[in-house]
């Protein structure tokens, strides 16, 4: 996963946070769509007494239980694929982290699902920042996350959710933020 784009001036530091538009999400959406439609057409073939799949022979399938079961699994996979395509279209989870010395604030912006929380924007004054916290866990389920420590509030996650970023990207971003805000880093 590539490091998010950086926009930096002497007054503003901005990191783009990638959302759901990753190659793995496109892959799963495509596989679920093709597999779900394949199962759906295979399950419907015994009911319409026509082979709806030109690359396969469905004459051996019976209406019950095989046809009904394949229709059920095909419909379920198609619904899941619709969810994936919706998440991709809305780019859920994408946004930016912006540190603004001129307006003396930090802004965390993310896109969500339609409704009350479609746009998530968290703004804190720079004076409330205590430092950065880094959590690095290697092994079978690696975790590489960094948080903004705030006075009187819980830690805010700055790193993207999903696949862990490369260690070099985490170090670059954390050091850029720490240098820009002149704050300390704990956990390294």
Curated annotation (Swiss-Prot):
Keywords per UniProt: Cell inner membrane, Cell membrane, Membrane, Photosynthesis, Transmembrane, Transmembrane helix
The record's annotation in InterPro entries points to:
PSI_Ycf4_assembly
Transmembrane parts of this sequence: 27-47, 70-90
Record's bilayer topology term: Multi-pass membrane protein
Location(s) in or outside the cell: Cell inner membrane
Q: Which GO terms describe its biological process?
A: photosynthesis
**Where primarily located?**
membrane
Q: Which GO terms describe its cellular component?
A: photosystem I; plasma membrane
HAMAP family membership? Ycf4
So what does this one do? Seems to be required for the assembly of the photosystem I complex.
Similarity field: Belongs to the Ycf4 family.
List the protein's name.
Answer: Photosystem I assembly protein Ycf4
Q: Which organism is it from?
A: Gloeobacter violaceus (strain ATCC 29082 / PCC 7421)
């Amino acid at each position: 996963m590539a490091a998010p784009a950086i926009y930096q001036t002497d007054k503003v530091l901005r990191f783009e946070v990638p959302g759901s538009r990753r190659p793995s999400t496109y892959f799963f959406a495509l596989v679920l769509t093709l597999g779900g439609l394949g199962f759906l057409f295979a399950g419907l073939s015994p009911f319409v007494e026509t082979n709806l799949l030109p690359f396969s022979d469905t004459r051996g399938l019976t209406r019950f239980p095989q046809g009904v079961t394949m229709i059920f699994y095909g419909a379920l996979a198609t619904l899941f694929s619709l969810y994936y395509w919706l998440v991709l279209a809305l780019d859920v989870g994408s946004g930016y982290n912006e540190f603004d010395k001129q307006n003396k604030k930090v802004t965390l912006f993310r896109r969500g699902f339609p409704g009350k929380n479609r746009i998530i924007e968290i703004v804190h004054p720079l004076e409330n920042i205590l430092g950065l916290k880094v959590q690095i866990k290697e092994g079978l389920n690696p975790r590489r996350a960094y948080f903004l420590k705030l006075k009187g509030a819980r830690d805010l996650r700055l790193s993207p959710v999903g696949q862990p970023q490369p260690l070099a990207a985490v170090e670059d971003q954390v050091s850029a933020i720490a240098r820009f805000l002149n704050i300390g880093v704990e956990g390294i």
